[in-house]
Amino acid sequence: MEILPKYKPEEILAIIHTHPKGPAEPSINDLLMARHVLTNNKNTIHGVLAENDGKLQLIMYNYWTIDGSKLAKMLSRFLDNGVKPPREEKLKVAHAYVTNIEDFDVSKIPEIADHFALWRYYWLIDTSDLFVFDPSNIDIYKKLKEKALFIPTGRDEGWLVLGVDTSGAEPIVYKVKECKDKVTLRSTGHEFSPIIVEWCKEKPMCRVA
């Protein structure tokens, strides 16, 4: 099994993140007021870091529901000639999530931009095979970062592969599904197949962290 390279955005226009929660259709003005937008092209912006009433806010969009062509057109209009879209114009993005971040370290953007890094950051594996919110467990964070592959299959579910290496050993695979404040893991045994790996390689959001 080939270990996929870690995603590194080529261009930073604003800061991005993904998360399948929150209100729908944030305004294009959220983008225009942003300090940073992280993207590899104008069609794949996932979210912004903005300031509102003196507080830093991370506005995270779901990758799968962005209207890429409309977003590209709106951004081009603004970035190329400074024309600001009307306030009522909305991005057709489902599941935006807004959170205040007091001490956000911009230098960590490449880490956070990785889709699996998002899951690592908000949940960890504990002894009961659950992902539970707790970003403070550095040991598990590092272990997942070194030996895990996340394959998204929908807005709130995907495959989690542990023990990925080049030795040919059978990987440990879980089907992951978000459920309110935690993510349940169900071992899939031999359900994992090379077909999934090949499919994964073609997806921009699928990578080893």
From Swiss-Prot:
Q: Which GO terms describe its molecular function?
A: metal ion binding; metallopeptidase activity
Where is the MPN domain positioned along the sequence?
1-67
Q: Does the keyword Zinc apply?
A: yes
Known InterPro entries for this protein? JAB_dom_prok (IPR028090), MPN (IPR037518)
One matching Pfam family, short form? Prok-JAB
* Keywords, alphabetical: Hydrolase, Metal-binding, Metalloprotease, Protease, Zinc
Q: Where is this motif: JAMM motif?
A: 17-30
Q: Where does Zn(2+) bind?
A: H17, H19, D30
* A GO BP annotation: proteolysis
Return the protein name.
Uncharacterized protein ORF209
Q: Which organism is it from?
A: Acidianus two-tailed virus (ATV)
